[in-house]
Amino acid sequence: MVFSSNVFLFLFLPIFLGLYYLSGQRYRNLLLLLASYVFYAWWRVDFLALFAAVTLWNYWIGLKVGAAGVRTKPAQRWLLLGVVVDSINVMMKSAGLEPFILTHVLLPIGISFYIFESISYIIDVYRGDTPATRNLIDFAAFVAIFPHLIAGPVLRFRDLADQFNNRTHTLDKFSEGCTRFMQGFIKKVFIADTLAVVADHCFALQNPTTGDAWLGALAYTAQLYFDFSGYSDMAIGLGLMMGFRFMENFKQPYISQSITEFWRRWHISLSTWLRDYLYITLGGNRKGTLTTYRNLFLTMLLGGLWHGANITYIVWGAWHGMWLAIEKAIGLNTSPRSFNPVRWAFTFLLVVMGWVIFRAENLHVAGRMYGAMFSFGEWSLSELNRANLTGLQVATLVVAYATLAFFGLRDFYTNRPAEKTKPADPSLIKAVPGDNPGSIHEPGFTVGQDAAVQPAYWTADWPRYAMRAAVLLLFVASILKLSAQSFSPFLYFQF
């Protein structure tokens, strides 16, 4: 089951929300757990055995680590055992092997996300950042909570533990959640799915022209953002409907003026996870300059490997790791107060080049695309491409980049760092390996929760209601479009 499907919109979600709000407060976590298991079992019922095993294992390991004491040798041994067992399936997936627990079943959808969350839980217990919970229902609901289950954000128990017991349910929060969900749905169905056809066709061409290659690269760059951030918006919106407030996962990443800044804004829950549980574990920046560069590179290399064993993901991770190390080495200002078009264009070029190899099935396809992009030969589209490209697809691509430019620049000038004479707000600038963690909001389409940092003209009542009305109309149009198209899963399902 996926969010962008009729069965979820018109069957699962209404039934769940109805039962949820009819239930008493003490039963809502149990109902959430059961609903999440139904959501997950929609793919394969036998996946639930693995799901339950992972949950019980990490619940037990957490108790053992907690009982052994913070950062003690016995706790370290329990932690190591927990991480090794948790990682078996992920490591076998990365190696291209069959998962260990379920014979003849591919690694279940979403396992990387809930394994990451389970590992972060037992590490936090070991470090003393959160106590080991004895409430099995709350812990199981945390692992299984369906809004983020398939493609994140990567949640942490220490951030949600209090919300499982003390979250609030208000009409404003529910309305905010509905708006956020609809925004994500529009991103996915209206924009990402339309651009997917363009990107797929361009990457499949055997002899692309320079124009074909750049069209495919730019279409995929926009598709991936609107697809993945759309899922995150829907997940965050669903959480708000249930009283939860999840961390933001995107903050207008394509406005970045460095790769370091890009990783503060892109897939924030994963980048902060890699920083807190991998980069810092490797030593961070505490063991000398060269070691810092090595740790940055290894963190991103392993981040690429997390996506799969395909050499393209590894090269993509190495590409980003290399530029992170270079920017660190030259002392680049990664929190600029002014917008520099040259720096932005160079950063965007690096990101697009990375997405080409990320999207390519193999190095041969990537080489074919790069060769066409930088041969600067025929800029016109091939006849095959012109025959398949529609006016709607072109218009969608233009609207996508206009949207990215408008909201990106608005975010930059609204939330840019303070003057050097004033201490910068770490919640706005810290979310990359080597820095301190921070919760970051993406003002992009968001209404309500970011009002404190938005200009007065944006938080006035009339534009808010006008935007919500526009979102509702586009949401209805997206549902009609969904009914007429074939099934289109989110891109990050494969990871």
From Swiss-Prot:
Q: Which domain of life is it from?
A: Bacteria
Ranges that cross the membrane: 7-24, 39-61, 101-123, 136-158, 296-318, 344-366, 387-409, 471-493
GO molecular-function terms, A-Z = acyltransferase activity
**What keywords are annotated for this sequence in UniProt?**
Acyltransferase, Alginate biosynthesis, Cell inner membrane, Cell membrane, Membrane, Transferase, Transmembrane, Transmembrane helix
Question: Enzyme group, top EC level?
Answer: transferase
Pathway linked to the protein: Glycan biosynthesis; alginate biosynthesis
Q: Which InterPro entries match?
A: Ac/AlaTfrase_AlgI/DltB (IPR024194), AlgI (IPR028362), MB_O-acyltransferase (IPR051085), MBOAT_fam (IPR004299)
This entry's Enzyme Commission designation comes to: 2.3.1.-
Q: Which GO terms describe its cellular component?
A: plasma membrane
Q: How does it sit in the membrane?
A: Multi-pass membrane protein
Q: Does the keyword Translocase apply?
A: no
Provide the active-site residues from the annotation: 307
One GO BP annotation of this record: alginic acid biosynthetic process
Cellular localisation: Cell inner membrane
Q: What does this protein do?
A: Together with AlgJ and AlgF, forms an inner membrane complex which probably interacts with the alginate polymerization-transport complex and adds acetyl groups at the O-2 and O-3 positions of mannuronate residues. Acetylation of alginate is important for the architecture of biofilms and increases the ability of alginate to act as a defense barrier.
Family classification: Belongs to the membrane-bound acyltransferase family.
Task: Check the record and name the PANTHER family matching this protein.
Answer: ACYLTRANSFERASE, TEICHOIC ACID D-ALANYLTRANSFERASE
What is the official name of this protein in its record?
Answer: Probable alginate O-acetylase AlgI
Give the originating organism: Pseudomonas fluorescens
Q: Which gene encodes it?
A: algI
